Amino acid sequence: MTLLTACGGGESNVESGNRDGFLHYGNGAEPQGLDPHVVTGVPENHIVRALFEGLAVKNPITLEPEPGVAERWDISDDGTVYTFYINPEAKWSNGEPMTASDYVWSWNRALHPDTGSLYAYMLYPIVNSEAYSKREITDFDQVGVKALDDLTLQVTLNAPTPYFLQLMDHYSSFAVHPETLLKHGKMTDRFTPWTRVGNIVSNGAFTLDEWSLNRRIIIKKSEHYWDRDAVALNGVYFYPTENVVSEERMFRAEQLHYTQVVPLDKIPEYRKQGNTSYVQAAYLGTYYYLVNTDKAPVDDVLVRRALSYALDRDTLTRTVLQETAIPAYSITPPDTLGYNPPKLFDYDPAKARELLAEAGYPNGEGWPGLEIIYNTQEAHRKIAVAVQQMWKKELNIDVSISNQEWKVYLNSVSQRDFQVARRGWIGDYVDANNFLDLFLTDGGNNNTGYANDEFDDIILNLAPKAKSRDERYSLFYKAETMMTVSYTHLRAHVTAMYLV
């Protein structure tokens, strides 16, 4: 990251931050919360990962797992038993030592059906975790998580899981402080005051110092973090700014060191600048539209196919997105750790019109209407307008678009109160499984209504037991093919752009 230095009269945030060791960060929306077992969004992720740390952490360059709370680990010869040895210096922010029992309690909470964690399925590689999460068993002692002593945690898996250590760096696997949660409610309660300033006890490099709603969140370096001397920053200011233009203006005024959003019409200007602060880089993520398969008219696969064939992704990425993205024809990004997903369709407006007519809407006649929802941001609006215009031009159908504030949007998606909804998925770990398991039947992040027993069996049982990477990827390809032809989501692009 490049830190900017201020110029002109008065001291900017960048100038004071450079002097005092505080990063000023544009964080998009106001976070829904800071509970690792409840939140799901990118704005929440940035803060939660600063406040908490997992058993392992990813090296930012190699992406390989490195020691976090666990100073080391052993893996059995058959790859199914992980033994984590907790660092004796790992402490909670109140100074209490971390223990293996903290993880047993926390994973009980994350998997408990009453908690309603949308990421519970992340822990399904663990023996009996899925059965516990689905109330098929009620005794957590039957789940493959055991505290052998205060500093030794043993985890038993259903099958060798290549990405399991990467999961230890995802907030769904983070430990929470049991006594703090129970002081403010039951183990499974959601959005209680335990995450507020003065209440929260965390274990990461930073602690929560201030949370001024819709203004800023301040975190400061923790006095009790085990690797405190390696933390370069004294703190971070997170600013919730859903207005992209305002956030970019803050960046230019040197009120921010870093922003991940850039007004699309400003990108050519930044590209022309010498020594520019604009960075465009590969991102393991896919931008797509969710389709609620229980809502007419998109409950008809013919309609969903027509909408997909009528979407000109090349034009969208070239003109609207200023070539900051590549067209996406699958949920999994191309070449994800060597896995290349199927491409089963392309832009074909004639085929789209044929499919729509077959569905009973020739040339758009009798079309009942359709709404796209998206969370408030200018780029999302421009994409929605472009898609709206493409569908009108090619299919002669009317589509309305509606923006929603971040928390309202998250609720609409989780309650499946939409026909078509903007969505993006950033890889939590580097593996195609992280994109495909989004569509498991009744999965916490499956908001489409897609349900396929064969798909579930491949993702949950067959792929984990594959004898080779080629066999595993072949199974992924089969699963992604059957899921793609259901057209439960309309892939748009893969992208990354930000200012530093």
Residue ranges and their predicted role:
Residues 209-220, 237-295, 318:
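Extracellular/periplasmic solute-recognition and catalytic clefts
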Residues 220-221, 299-389, 393, 449-454, ...:
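Append "and occasionally in soluble cytosolic enzymes with long acidic Gly/Pro-rich linkers
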Residues 318, 397-409, 414, 434-491, ...:
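Extracytoplasmic/peripheral linker and loop segments enriched in polar/acidic and small residues
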